[in-house]
Structure formats: structure tokens, C-alpha cells
Curated annotation (Swiss-Prot):
The keyword Transcription applies. Probable transcription factor. The gene is ATHB-54. Residues 125-153 are annotated as: Leucine-zipper. This is Homeobox-leucine zipper protein ATHB-54. Residues 65-124 bind DNA. Residues 175-198 are annotated as: Disordered. SUPFAM superfamilies: Homeodomain-like. It comes from Arabidopsis thaliana (Mouse-ear cress). One of its GO terms (cellular component) is nucleus. The lineage of its organism: Eukaryota, Viridiplantae, Streptophyta, Embryophyta, Tracheophyta. PANTHER family: HOMEOBOX-LEUCINE ZIPPER PROTEIN (PTHR24326), HOMEOBOX-LEUCINE ZIPPER PROTEIN ATHB-54 (PTHR24326:SF606). GO terms for molecular function: DNA-binding transcription factor activity, RNA polymerase II-specific; sequence-specific DNA binding.
Length: 227
């Protein structure tokens, strides 16, 4: 009877301990203990309490364990960096060789290379972006310089066109004046020749006077003779 009471007290004590600490270390995260094998798991004792948030807590615990496993020593990091610089891709044989050499799990080596490639690509993109920005700035500066030079040349061309137009106008006016001058000289010469011929004809308009030695002068008028 005394042994039966002692077993009952031990049973209830373990039950309370399981209920108080089930949120820290769920039974599904550990192998079954001798107590759970003898008395049953905490989920069998109190299913509602044991299953509450058990999956989340178990996942958190396993993530902490994985994080601890991923923590690498400086020597391991240096060797992994050297291997990454040699070859960015991780082949299966190389993964197993590195894991054995560094004392790591192959999955740890694979995850490290995956993260390292992601960081490498990010830095490469940043470098390419900076290079493109620098190239754009240089092209923009060159374009601004060429634009100013183009405007200057355009102004010079416009000025030369204006001067050429003025020169053409002057030449046209000179040719026109020369042409008009030649026409005026020709008309004057024709008029002079016509006047001389007309005077000779008028000299003999009155032959009876010509016999007496008088000749017709068309320039004579009554006012000239004061008649």
C-alpha cells in the first residue's frame, strides 16, 4: 500500500512537470524517456495541453539547433571562401569533399555556398549599377559638350548664310546697275546719231535758202532771235 501511494505521488509530480515545461521542450522533439515509456507521453496524459503550440515550439527549437550547426569557425570560413573564389558552383563530389575536409554536413556546405552566391550576385549587381551610372554620367557630360558645340556651329552657319545672301544681293545689284548703264549709253548714242542725221536733213529742207548760203538750224527759236 505504501509503495502504491509513492508511485501515485511520483506520477502526479511528473505530470505537473510535463505540463509546466511542455512549451519549452515538447515531447515530440526528443526521444521517449523511461518515464514516458512507463507512464505514457504527456500528450496521452493531457492531449489538449500537450498539443497547444507544440508544432511551433518544436520548429523553433529545431531552427536553433540548425543555427548552432551552421555556426562555422574562422578556419572553416576561410577555406570555404578560398574554395568559392576558385569555383562559384558546387558540384556534388566537391560538396562531399569539402564536408569531409571541414568536418561539416554536406547540407551545411550547400547552404553556405547558396548564401554566398546570393551575396556575390548582389554585389555584382551593385557594381554593374555603379558602372552604368558612371557611364551614363560621362555620356551626359559628353552630350552636353557636343550640344554646346553644335549650337555654336549652327550660329556660325546662320551668320555665314546671312553674309552669303548679302553678297549675292550686292552682286545682283551691281550686275543690274551695269546692265542699266550699258542700256543708257546705247540709248544716248542712238539719240545723238538721230539728232545729227535730222540736222543734216533739215539743212536742206529749204534748198532755195541753201543756195544763198543759209542753212536751217533747228535749235533756233523766236526767243533766241529776240523777235
Amino acid at each position: 500500500m505504501e509503495n502504491s501511494d509513492t508511485d501515485s505521488e511520483v506520477f502526479f509530480w511528473f505530470q505537473n512537470q510535463n505540463q509546466n515545461h511542455s512549451h519549452k521542450f515538447p515531447s515530440s522533439c526528443f526521444p521517449p524517456s523511461s518515464h514516458s515509456a512507463f507512464y505514457g507521453s504527456s500528450s496521452m496524459i493531457n492531449t489538449e495541453t500537450a498539443t497547444m503550440d507544440e508544432e511551433d515550439v518544436c520548429e523553433s527549437y529545431m531552427m536553433r539547433e540548425i543555427t548552432k550547426k551552421r555556426k562555422l569557425t574562422p578556419i572553416q570560413l576561410r577555406l570555404l571562401e578560398e574554395s568559392f573564389e576558385e569555383e562559384k558552383r558546387l558540384e556534388p563530389d566537391r560538396k562531399l569533399w569539402l564536408a569531409e575536409k571541414l568536418g561539416l554536413q554536406p547540407s551545411q556546405v550547400a547552404v553556405w555556398f547558396q548564401n554566398r552566391r546570393a551575396r556575390y550576385k548582389t554585389k555584382q549587381l551593385e557594381h554593374d549599377c555603379d558602372s552604368l551610372k558612371a557611364s551614363y554620367a560621362k555620356l551626359k557630360t559628353d552630350w552636353d559638350i557636343l550640344f554646346v558645340q553644335n549650337q555654336t556651329l549652327k550660329s556660325k552657319v546662320d551668320l555665314l548664310k546671312e553674309k552669303l545672301k548679302m553678297q549675292e544681293n550686292l552682286e545682283t545689284q551691281s550686275i543690274e546697275r551695269k546692265r542699266l548703264g550699258e542700256e543708257g549709253s546705247s540709248v544716248k548714242s542712238d539719240n545723238t546719231q538721230y539728232s545729227e542725221e535730222e540736222g543734216l536733213e533739215n539743212q536742206y529742207s529749204f534748198p532755195e535758202l541753201a543756195v544763198l548760203g543759209f542753212y536751217y538750224d533747228p535749235t533756233l527759236t523766236a526767243s533766241n532771235l529776240r523777235l
